[in-house]
Amino acid sequence: MSSYQQNPIGSFGGLYGSGGIEKSSQIIGNYRLDKTLGIGSFGKVKLAEHIRTGVKVAIKILNRTKIKNLKMDEKIRREIQNMKLFRHPHIIKLYEVIETTTDIFMVMEYVTGGELFEYIVKNGKLLEDESRRLFQQMISGVDYCHHHMVVHRDLKPENLLLDPINKCIKIADFGLSNMMQDGDFLKTSCGSPNYAAPEVISGKLYAGPEVDVWSCGVILYAFLCAKLPFDDESIPMLFKKIREGVFSIPDFVSPSCADLIKKMLVVDPVKRITIHEIRNHPWFQVKLPKYLSSPHTFLSKSIQTINNSILNEMVQVYAPIDRERIIEELQKSGEVNDLIVSYHLLVDSKRGSYENEINSPNLVSPITTPIMSSAQKSPIMFTTTTGFNPSNSNSISNNNNNNNNNNNNTTNNNNNTTNNNNSIINNNNINNNNINNNNNNNNNNINNNNIINNNNNNNNNNNNNNNNNNNNNNNNNNNSSISGGTEVFSISPNLNNSYNSNSSGNSNGSNSNNNSNNNTNNDNNNNNNNNNNNNNNNNNNNNNNNNNNNCIDSVNNSLNNENDVNNSNINNNNNNNSDDGSNNNSYEGGGDVLLLSDLNGNNQLGGNDNGNVVNLNNNFQLLNSLDLNSDIQTQPHRKWYLGAISQLPPHEIMGEIYRALKKVGFEWKLTGPYQLRCRMVNGKPIKLVLQLFRVAENRYLLDIKKIEGEIFIFFDICSLMLEELNL
């Protein structure tokens, strides 16, 4: 046998790393073709055998001409790339992609049990325990794909294959089916519309995982009843039933299961139960296998631990290649070669029950996608647990309950320093606002978003030399992120650059004073003054001028002084008292605050990472904060935001967004649930990301973020966009 040489990369190779192509009537690459298993939208599905290992695979053949005629080539590339990321026990695996001049060959896992639809037709309704077991597997696979930002949109029993060896189901065609063009459901779906959500058959624009939740509800109903909740020989009557959402559940279905089905088959997609809520439903939790108990228990795509028995078999199959060379090829990251494919084929062909493999070293936790956080309340990826009250600092959630004070600030030990941070505490030997005294008063952390004003009479100082015997661990970190985070609130701009907010601080220690100071034109002649003033004449050392525009992002100008720290009498024996001395200034996405108004005059918001504020009126004219004389090379990288609030339903908002984008001259693509990536058709160097968030009940935020281009072009474009939008 000749020595092993890696096959040349095909035309898809740069993206997929597929092997070389040998095509005859029976051979494609390293596979020998066999009988036809079925015919799909783009071509046939063939049974094949991997020549080296003898493992059976299914090869989906996609005809290039059909793909081109349907204008689906770019979507095919993107969805194939998504599918190659999937390594889940209940999703059909895609091992590699081979390309010829006429066809694309997707080498996939072969499952021998056939379609679940045929099983139900043959055996009738399933027992509730069996239905629950299969439903748990299906939801786990759907949840995994949603975490990878792929929505199926055509789930049905025909796309669920039975694996008789492992006694489980596997989702097929996941990722390819969501290439359907909106409004063309009946033309592109070769199956029945009985499983489609109301928003799909109505031709409304949709983008989220809620359509899969509906389909899963219909499938669960079919498991239990061997019939469909919505069925009619007349397609118009069928659509009418689906839109109305009226169905009956037989008495033999348990009340808990019936409750879950009803919550999944809610016509309004916003009110429909989410995957996360399904996982927590009492009926779903019964007899839930350990390996399905967490959405983050997935098989790793990379080979982290090599199975010795599989390795020994490969040494024999690929002789005379030595063992070390095989190990080297298997451990190559971000690459697919024949040895890696062979290893996965052998592992999968010998794998027993997945329930026995939960402790396998190949089981890892995936990277969680922020926009699909399981903690979200609805399919739209943004929630808030508090009202829009800018005057109440307690309305901002505290996400840090330990003793590590991650600061949004900088402690300065220099003289005459000017700072534009949210808050400054200036004291020698005090780092990161964390003060440790040697009199059992430990870890008294000053809230970062505060301002200390010390005038001539040393206000807010407790002259007891810190002789407190309280063992308090007071952490007042408000990790609030603005645009793209978990808290949203509105701010009213003051054109005099004075922002007043009476905040109620948190006090856990004794002798606590919570002050909100905003003084002007003060002459301070003392040391260690921390001023939040305009036009101050300071004649002292260690003066820190915290000029203008502070504490805007957190809407909190209060001082939370735990045990009232005396700035001139601190007995500190440690110059580095914080466990985490890093600056934590970056909100998600970064950017400066943009205060603007919607068509109703309501103030909107943006994100800030350094306290600077850009005030915009309805014409989006820049008022302040931009230093036009500074060297752009010396400025930190910023991402700019604009936004608009609406109370329209999400699908209507998305429809209005599409209309406005087309009117202004954008082209776009869907990159996630309720998320669009846009660029100008006329070639203007500007790229945007649009994201729709739910910020309250029946209240939605359209966030517009610049990811490329000049800031003033961004302002002009957004001005046109927001004028065009009718929200």
UniProtKB/Swiss-Prot annotation:
Its biological purpose is as follows: Activated enzyme phosphorylates target proteins and initiates downstream signaling pathways that shift metabolism from anabolic to catabolic pathways. Acts as a highly sensitive cellular energy sensor.
**Assembly with partners or alone:** Heterotrimer of an alpha catalytic subunit, a beta and a gamma non-catalytic subunits.
| Matches recorded under SUPFAM superfamilies | KA1-like, Protein kinase-like (PK-like)
The Gene Ontology biological process annotation of the record reads: asexual reproduction; ATP biosynthetic process; autophagy; cellular response to diterpene; mitochondrion organization; negative regulation of asexual reproduction; negative regulation of gene expression; phagocytosis
Renumbered to this chain, the Low complexity biased-composition regions fall at: 391-483, 494-586
Keywords for this entry? ATP-binding, Kinase, Nucleotide-binding, Phosphoprotein, Serine/threonine-protein kinase, Transferase
Q: Which residues form the Protein kinase domain?
A: 31-284
This protein's superkingdom?
Answer: Eukaryota
Residues bearing the modification Phosphothreonine? T188
Q: What's this protein's name?
A: 5'-AMP-activated serine/threonine-protein kinase catalytic subunit alpha
The primary gene name is snfA
Cysteine pairings via disulfide bonds: none
Q: Report the EC code(s) recorded for this entry.
A: 2.7.11.1
Q: Which one of the record's GO molecular function terms can you name?
A: ATP binding
Starting at the broadest rank, the lineage of the source organism is: Eukaryota, Amoebozoa, Evosea, Eumycetozoa, Dictyostelia
The segments labelled Disordered in the record are 382-590
Q: What family is reported?
A: Belongs to the protein kinase superfamily. CAMK Ser/Thr protein kinase family. SNF1 subfamily.
Q: Which reaction does it catalyse?
A: L-seryl-[protein] + ATP = O-phospho-L-seryl-[protein] + ADP + H(+); L-threonyl-[protein] + ATP = O-phospho-L-threonyl-[protein] + ADP + H(+)
